[in-house]
Amino acid sequence: MEWETVIGLEIHAQLATRSKIFSGAPTAYGAEPNTQACAIDLGLPGVLPVLNREAVRMAVKFGLAIGAEIAPVSVFARKNYFYPDLPKGYQISQYDLPVVARGKLSINVDGKALTIGITRAHLEEDAGKSLHEDFHGYTGIDLNRAGTPLLEIVSEPDLRSAKEAVAYMKKLHALVRYLEICDGNMQEGSFRCDANVSVRPKGQTKFGTRAEIKNLNSFRFVEKAINHEIARQIEILEGGGEVIQETRLYDSVKDETRSMRSKEEANDYRYFPDPDLLPLEISSGFIEEVKATLPELPDAKRDRFKAQYGLSDYDAEVLTASREMADFYETVVREAAGDPKLCANWVMVELSGLLNKDGLEITASKIDAAGLASLVRRIADATISGKIAKQVLETMWNEGGSADDIIERQGLKQITDTGAIESIIDQIIAANPEQLAQYRAGKDKLFGFFVGQAMKATQGKANPAQLNELLKKKLQ
């Protein structure tokens, strides 16, 4: 039997506010346990939550970016459940009246354009964190994270493979960073995913029984966990068994999912409106105010890069994958005042290679955009060849310094004097009469031999175009 996979993702994006969603406690990552939790976060009596306006602004900004409806009135609800790191015994979230509803996101998978529906995006507070190490068999509770603002983004069940799920998640990750509403740091838990996975016979419209895989915090783990879960469910069904609705956890070491608990339904949480918080009213004026702050979005920037700089689909996609990369590239083009394609190659290939080697993001590059632009200018004006430029780039990366200083100090300028190049060619031809005879007898591949000898003699500094042209004339 042929099976079809149905996937929906719930993505939790930690909003980049300075304080928590219902208190003034800070949200900085990495502080000593329980040093960033106030009475509200601890659930102590006699204190009331106050909604963070900036968190609302960020949620609205996201909604506008995905073409969603912004609710004029939305309601906060208490989601009741017990967990050691949930001090109040409930989580403040949104249920039937979320702030954002009915949006969409376009993705491209293997050249195929897909539109993924986004059911809703709602505001909620994060829970604390259970610490299981260094407590001699006990569990420690760190409530620094309790009350941190989250935007939970729930997709429609429109995804049909792990590959599509990862593409959607990457697109969403780029979007929240473009909007500057989330830093997207997956290692720190700022952007994490729950995946709802089910399978059904191909052609069937009724959904299969789903399992939810919790807290996936890397694109690689999302793909591996979903693929494993698909295989697990198909194996059960083909063996005559029945998939049960449950929550599962992905074990990255064993590359498997394991059961955590039976999957709760909404009524298990006994949602009801939070009596301590008034309904959230969002005016059209506030929406317009937020709309005015929207940056150029990834899809629009990609299309502009193709039109303005003549880039291919692939190049434009790579260079606009992050706002920081796009800004870096445009600065290089502007400072170099040169060929946008040449600039793209040096950003995407040479510089990115060094970044990947050292595990750095573009924001931590040892060579800034102006520095790379100065190197590109020297390639464009034929001061140095592309091969020499790679050596200069390595030196700039490892030792610092400007391209011009390194070129001057190491004597790397191209030899462009026609007389000097002709003299070197004459010496090489005189020293290799046998190869000359073979070339003139029709062995054209020996042309590369003469080029190599000339480059060796000039330590790679001969202008390649001039060298080729003069060499062809001399060898005739």
Swiss-Prot record:
Biological process according to GO: glutaminyl-tRNAGln biosynthesis via transamidation; translation
Gene3D superfamilies on file: 1.10.10.410, GatB domain, N-terminal subdomain
PROSITE patterns: GATB
Entry GO MF terms: asparaginyl-tRNA synthase (glutamine-hydrolyzing) activity; ATP binding; glutaminyl-tRNA synthase (glutamine-hydrolyzing) activity
Pfam family, one: GatB_Yqey
Residue ranges that the Swiss-Prot or TrEMBL entry lists as coiled coil: none
This protein's UniProt keywords: ATP-binding, Ligase, Nucleotide-binding, Protein biosynthesis
InterPro entries in alphabetical order: Asn/Gln-tRNA_amidoTrfase_suB/E, Asn/Gln-tRNA_Trfase_suB/E_cat, Asn/Gln_amidotransferase, Asn/Gln_tRNA_amidoTrase-B-like, GatB, GatB_C_1, GatB_Yqey_C_2, Gln-tRNA_amidoTrfase_suB_CS
Entry keyword annotation includes Ligase: yes
Top-level taxon: Bacteria
SUPFAM superfamilies according to UniProt: GatB/YqeY motif, Glutamine synthetase/guanido kinase
Subunit structure: Heterotrimer of A, B and C subunits.
Family statement: Belongs to the GatB/GatE family. GatB subfamily.
Name under which the protein is recorded: Aspartyl/glutamyl-tRNA(Asn/Gln) amidotransferase subunit B
Lineage of the species this protein comes from: Bacteria, Pseudomonadati, Pseudomonadota, Gammaproteobacteria, Methylococcales
Designated gene of the protein: gatB
